[in-house]
Regions:
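Flexible, glycine-/basic-rich loop-and-beta segments that form/coincide
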Residues: 2-62
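C-terminal target-recognition/interaction regions appended to catalytic cores
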Residues: 63-219
């Protein structure tokens, strides 16, 4: 993700700035040991999760369909799937049910710009867009900040919003991480429930957290 983060690091004695220096210096080695090369674009991250590869009934919500795995076409996808051999159905890869008119708006959003920019109704670029702003993703670009609102993004090659699993991939959750609970919720329920999209969006990306842990352990 192209995401700004605020990191506060404190140390009793020593040089606190050393943490950030080590974090930056360790990045290339950290990725190399996992067979990864930065930057990782959207298609590299979620290209094997496209709807075109097939659908089955969702294991946890029978009224919905769940996507299945497509062929691995990047080192990142291989790394995300390395612990789930023999599994055909990704956890939390449930497709939303959108009305035909909504799908038409998604299709117009997909061709409205060559860049992954946030498009708002005031820009008058997309007919029928009523939401405050939507970002149509581009397969060859780095993803903007993953949010807890599913319809903030439109998929780069299919007229739909992202699934929880696709958001999780963009956050660097490996596919063996199982999300549970409701997919979305609203209103007063948000005070007592944490739906899956929010679980993903509010998390510290696991790969980043692992790198931080390695640096801290070495200080």
């Amino acid at each position: 993700q192209n995401r700004k983060r605020f990191i506060l690091f404190a140390i009793k004695g020593g040089k606190a700035e050393l943490f950030f220096e080590k974090l930056d210096a360790n990045k290339a080695t950290f990725l190399k040991h996992r067979g990864l090369i930065a930057p990782i674009c959207v298609n590299d991250a979620i290209g094997d999760l496209q709807r075109k590869y097939g659908e089955v009934q969702s294991p946890d919500t029978p009224r919905f369909n769940n996507g299945v795995y497509g062929p691995i076409n990047s080192a990142y996808q291989k790394y995300m799937r390395h612990n789930i051999t023999g599994i055909d159905i990704p956890n939390s890869h449930r497709f939303a049910q959108s009305k035909p008119k909504t799908v038409e708006v998604f299709e117009r959003l997909m061709v409205a710009s060559n860049q992954a920019i946030r498009i708002t109704p005031k820009m008058e670029m997309v007919e029928g867009l009523k939401k405050r702003g939507v970002t149509p993703l581009k397969g060859n670009c780095i993803c903007p900040t993953v949010t807890s609102i599913p319809d903030d993004f439109v998929h780069y090659s299919e007229p739909r919003i992202l699934t929880v699993r696709e958001c999780a991939r963009l956050q660097s959750f490996s596919d063996d991480y199982v999300f549970q609970g409701k997919y979305t919720t609203g209103g007063a329920r948000r005070k007592i429930e944490v739906p899956r999209y929010t679980q993903v969006a509010n998390a510290v990306p696991p790969l980043f957290a692992e790198q931080v842990g390695i640096v801290l352990r070495g200080m």
